[in-house]
Amino acid sequence: MFAKPTTRIVYLTAFALVISVLETLASESGFVPVGVGGYATIPPQGTRLPQSVIYKSDNLKKRLPTNKWWSSLAWDRFSNNMYPHPLAVRAMPEGLRVYYPGNNITASANAIMGSMPGGYADFVVGLSLVERFESAVVDDFGDWSVSALFRTNSTTMRANIVMGSPFVTFTFNGGIPAIRFANANAPKIIAGDEKSATLIVAIGNRYYGLFAPAGSKWNGIGSTVLTADTNGKNYFSVAVLPDNSAETLSLFQKYAHTHITNTVVQWVYDQEKCIVRTRFLFETKRYEGSEDAVIFALYPHQWLNTKTKLTDNTYNSVRGTMKVAIGREFTTEMVYPGVLPVLPVVKDANTDLMTTLIEREIKNQPRIVGDTYWLGKQLGKWTSLSQISAECGKDDMRNIFAGRIKMALENFFTPTNRTGSLKTSRDGVFYYDTNWGTLIGYPASYGSDDQLNDHHFHYGYFIRAAGEIVRQEPDWGRDEKWGGMVKMLIRDIANPDRSDAMFPFLRNLDVYAGHSWASGTARFADGNNNESSSEAVNAWYGIIMFGAATGNDEIRDLGIFLLTTEIEAINHYWFDVTEQFHPKDYRASVVTMVWGGKGVNETWFSNNPEMVHGINFLPFTPCSLYLGRYPEYCEKNYRALLGEKKAFLEKRGRKIGEQFKDSELWEAWTDITLMYHALSNPEDAFSQFSERLPGLNAEAGNSLANAYAWITMLKEFGAVERSITANHPFYAVFRKGNTLTYIAYNYKREPVKVKFSDNTELTVPPKSYRILQNQSKKR
C-alpha cells in the first residue's frame, strides 16, 4: 500500500546524480550549469550568508533540515524553547529542561498562550558529574524527531525528543541522571520511594514519571535534586502523565524503556478514492521489558482522520486536545480537495471591462529583477493575468505576460551576466550553500538568506509560474531547458528523497504538526512560527502544477500530499472551521499566526484587520477555492473582519454610522477582502467591488482583472461543494441552489473520463477543461 518516498521519486535521484557530477567541474567557473541555466557556487558579491557554524555532531552525515520545531538546536550552542507537544523542552547548559504547558494554557480575545515560562520549570535533566555542559548539538534526527547530544569532555548525555511523544528518553556516558527541580520546595512524591526504579512526582497540577532502569535507587528524596543510581545501566526516561492514577502509572511503566530511535513518514495519493494516505512509523529499541510499541499522542488533524485505536488518555495543547494511542505506527486518510490549473471566465463577465483591466496591467512597467518575495508576487500576478487573457481569447495579451514570466525566471535561473561573469546579489541569481544544503535566491528578503526563512513562500511563486508556462509551452520545462532549475527549487523546499546529498528531506513541512514552519532558525521563546498559511499552500500548488505540466506524477503526487496535509491543518488550527479547537475565551475568528507555543491574531507587519486576515488568503489563484470549502465559516470570518475593521477605523477617529456602506470600509487590500467574501456571498462581493472599481488599486500580488474574474465566476457558479470528490486530480464542484457545476481539467494528450463521487461522469478533451451543470441534484 505504501512505497517509501525515496523509491517513488525517481526523478530526483537521477537528476541529483547529474548535478553532483557537474559540481565537480564548478570550482573554476563558480557555477554549475543546469540545462541552459544554472546556479552559483561562489557567494555573489554583496550577499549575506547563514552562519558558518552548525551545531551538529560528527556522527551526523545526512543533510540537516532547517525550518523545524527543533531548528534552534542546530543554530545555537544551546537551543531556544522547543515545542514537541505535548511537552515543551529546552537544551540548556545544565541539561534538558522539561515542561508540560497543557494544564496552564490561557486564552484572551486575540491570543492562545501555551508557552514555556522563563527559568527552569518544571525540571532539568542532567548528569551528576556535570554542572554545565559545553554544548548541546544535533546528533541525529528523524522525520519529526531529534536527538540532542549534551557533551563535556568525554561525558555525554543523549536525549531523544519526539513530537507527539509524552516521553523523553536518555542514554548517557559518565555520571548518573540528575533531575534538578526549579521550585524552592522539593517535588511531591506521589508514587515510589528511594528503593523503587520509578518515581511519580507532582509539580503543581502536572504529573511526571521518572523511569530509571530496573534495580535502580534514588537519592535526594525530600530535596530539589534527585539522582538515580542506575545499577550500572546507561538509560533513563521521563514522561508527562495524563493523570496520577495507578492505571496510568502501570501503563507508562510498561513502555518506559522502549526508546524511539527514528521516525519515518510515507505517503500515497489514492486517486480513485481521492484521498492522501499517510503512514507514520516509529522505529524503536527496547532496553528492558517486553514491549516494542510506544505511547504517542495525536493532534486533532490526525485523530480526526485515523482509524487507529485510541485510548481514553488525553493531553492539552495549544492546537486542541491530543489523544493517546499505543503502537509502532498509525495511518491517516485525508480527502484531497482537488485543484484546477485555470478557472473559466464565465459568460456573465463583462469581457470589455476585463480587457480594460488587463490592458491597465500591461501598461505597468514590468519588474524583471527584485527580491525573491516581491518578484515572486509579481510572477504570481502575471501568471493569473496570462491565464485570464487566454480565457478571454486575447492570446496577444497572454503572450505579453508569459514573456515577462519567462524573462524574469530565465534571468534568475542564469548565474552569469552577458559578459560571462558571475552576477552580483542585486542582479537576480540563485546560489547553492554547501554548508547548509540550500539554494538561496538573491536579492533576498525577510531573512531568506542568512536565516533561511520563508523559502516555501518565495519559491512557491516561481514554481507555480513555471508550471503555467510549461502548461502552455511544454518544451520550456524540459530538464535540458529550464525545468532542471525549477526542480532545484522544489528540492530546496520539499525534497522527498532522504538520500539526496544536496538538500534535506521536506525542509518546510512539519509532517507531524501537519503544516509548514517559516523560520529557518526557530530562535524564539514561542518556538517556530508560520504566518501566511495560504502562501504555503501556493507553494504546494505550484509543485502539483509543475509535476502535471511536465507529465511527472511523482512530483505531482508530492505536491498533492503537501497541499492536502497543509489544508487540513489550516482548517483546524488557523480557521477552526468546526469550532472545536480554539478556546472559548479566544474570541477572534481566526488564528493568523501559529507558533509552537501559542496562536495569535496578529501579523509581523500590520495591525490593519484587512491585512491581518488577508495574509492567510493571498495569493488568490485557482487553488484558492480550498478557502471556500466551509462557506458558513467564510461568512463568519468575513463578519468578524467587518467588525474588526469598524473598530480599527473608529480608533483612528473615523466615525462609522449606521448608513455607512461596507464597501467604504476597505482601504488596504480591498480586492483580497472581497475575493474572500465572494466565497460565501458573491452577490454582495460583486456589488461592493463594482462600487469601488473606478478608483480601486489591487494588492501588489493581485490584479483587478483577477478579482473581477474570480468574483463573477462565483456569482455564476455559487459556493464550493466539498461533499463531492473525483477520481481525477484536477477538479472542482460548485453549488448554487439546486444546480451543481462540475469542472475538470485534462493535462493529457487524449480525452480522459472523470467520475465524481456522486456518479456524475465527465469526458474532458485533451489539454483543456470541461464544465457540466446538472440541475437535478438536490440536497
Feature-to-residue mapping (PLM):
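Polybasic, positively charged surfaces/segments
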Residues: 539
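Sec/Tat signal peptide C-region and signal peptidase I cleavage site
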Residues: 21-26
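Alpha-helix capping and helix-loop boundary segments enriched in small/acidic/polar residues
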Residues: 373, 449-453, 457, 477-481, ...
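Inter-helical turn/loop segments and adjacent helix faces that build the functional surface
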Residues: 389-396, 469-480, 543-557
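Ser/Thr/Asn(+Pro)-rich, low-complexity disordered segments
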Residues: 27-456, 486, 496-515, 519, ...
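Bacterial N-terminal signal peptides that target proteins for export
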Residues: 2-11
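Bacterial N-terminal signal peptides
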Residues: 11-20
